[in-house]
Amino acid sequence: MHNFEEELTCPICYSIFEDPRVLPCSHTFCRNCLENILQASGNFYIWRPLRIPLKCPNCRSITEIAPTGIESLPVNFALRAIIEKYQQEDHPDIVTCPEHYRQPLNVYCLLDKKLVCGHCLTIGQHHGHPIDDLQSAYLKEKDTPQKLLEQLTDTHWTDLTHLIEKLKEQKSHSEKMIQGDKEAVLQYFKELNDTLEQKKKSFLTALCDVGNLINQEYTPQIERMKEIREQQLELMALTISLQEESPLKFLEKVDDVRQHVQILKQRPLPEVQPVEIYPRVSKILKEEWSRTEIGQIKNVLIPKMKISPKRMSCSWPGKDEKEVEFLKILNIVVVTLISVILMSILFFNQHIITFLSEITLIWFSEASLSVYQSLSNSLHKVKNILCHIFYLLKEFVWKIVSH
């Protein structure tokens, strides 16, 4: 098939014949190739101006053609038919030029050391380059691969092999390091997640416990208030029903209403004492946990939450301004006295100082919260007791003055 392709190749452009024209000497060339030769010669005989001489590129014989030029030469219809049929068929064993459609690579460019087609030589980037036919170029380059291979010595091969092994070892070592880091990441975040999950459960458990304390504090009071309200509703219903009774029935039951009302009036309503939860989890998370290092989270203790009566300002009955001023001053004196006593205890108690100095930062924070809570509750109770005592003392003094 390759030899057959050579028969269909123009000897001038080394491409498949395009519009093949046959000369009187029986040699065939492309029409464009003959026109290029004719234009390049430019020789016209003066004595025979109506004939144009053309020298055959193969046999060098001169042919006189009509003034119409190459168009006057006959077309090689047989060759053109063969070419058309050849181009319609697929030839997978024939390598064609990637730049020129369906043009076979049948010439070897000596300058660029690559196969080219006829169009590459005439109109392409290889125009004017030295060329050689395939067979001749093959014979010249046949021993080239072996000669090039001989340039690679045994030492080079050994070095290359050792380098490959070294690269494989480094790659394996790096992959082991990466795998170890992956396992470390998984283990670290698993432990961190377990710690956070445990802390979360501890917080939720503590909140549930303080929620139970809230229920124990308020639910009985609410039930008692509901009971009193039900009694009052029953009394209101009884009062409405009496309006429809006869005078006799009315007088019999009105005393019952009077007694029930008297009982309800004498039954004191409990004072609503608000409570507060201490410490607040939201404040702990915002102020302490947000500043805690990740590695120290497992060492942070969950505080025990409690409820205590909400601290209220001490109120004084009476409308006399002098009395109020006196009691305010007395209140300041009492608070100052209590503060001095507590500061003295903290200053002179060596055991407390030793305890605070030996405790760690985390334990100190937790202990401080507990101490502050206990101290606050104690101060509040002492203050309320003193207020009550001074209130009774004031009542006693005013009664004596009144008499």
From Swiss-Prot:
GO molecular function terms here?
A: ubiquitin protein ligase activity; zinc ion binding
Q: Which residues form a coiled coil?
A: 163-246
**Membrane association type:** Single-pass membrane protein
What processes does the entry annotate via GO biological process terms?
host-mediated suppression of symbiont invasion; innate immune response; negative regulation of canonical NF-kappaB signal transduction; protein ubiquitination
TM annotation in the entry: 329-349
Any one GO cellular component localisation term in the record: endoplasmic reticulum membrane
SUPFAM superfamilies assigned: B-box zinc-binding domain (SSF57845), RING/U-box (SSF57850)
Q: Where are the zinc fingers (RING-type)?
A: 10-60
Q: Which Pfam families match?
A: zf-B_box, zf-RING_UBOX
Give residues annotated as binding Zn(2+): 97, 100, 120, 126
Q: Where are the zinc fingers (B box-type)?
A: 92-134
Superkingdom to which the source organism belongs: Eukaryota
Would the keyword Mitochondrion turn up in this protein's UniProt record?
A: no
Report the pathway entry.
Protein modification; protein ubiquitination
Give the InterPro entries listed for this entry.
Znf-RING_euk (IPR027370), Znf_B-box (IPR000315), Znf_RING (IPR001841), Znf_RING/FYVE/PHD (IPR013083), Znf_RING_CS (IPR017907)
Q: Give the chief site where it resides.
A: endoplasmic reticulum
Q: State the compartments where it is located.
A: Endoplasmic reticulum membrane
Q: Which residue pairs form cystines in this protein? A: none
- List its EC numbers: 2.3.2.27
Q: Which reaction does it catalyse?
A: S-ubiquitinyl-[E2 ubiquitin-conjugating enzyme]-L-cysteine + [acceptor protein]-L-lysine = [E2 ubiquitin-conjugating enzyme]-L-cysteine + N(6)-ubiquitinyl-[acceptor protein]-L-lysine
Q: Give the family from UniProt.
A: Belongs to the TRIM/RBCC family.
Q: Give the record's subunit note.
A: Interacts with ECSIT.
Official protein name in the record? Tripartite motif-containing protein 59
Q: What is the scientific name of the source organism?
A: Homo sapiens
Q: Which gene encodes it?
A: TRIM59
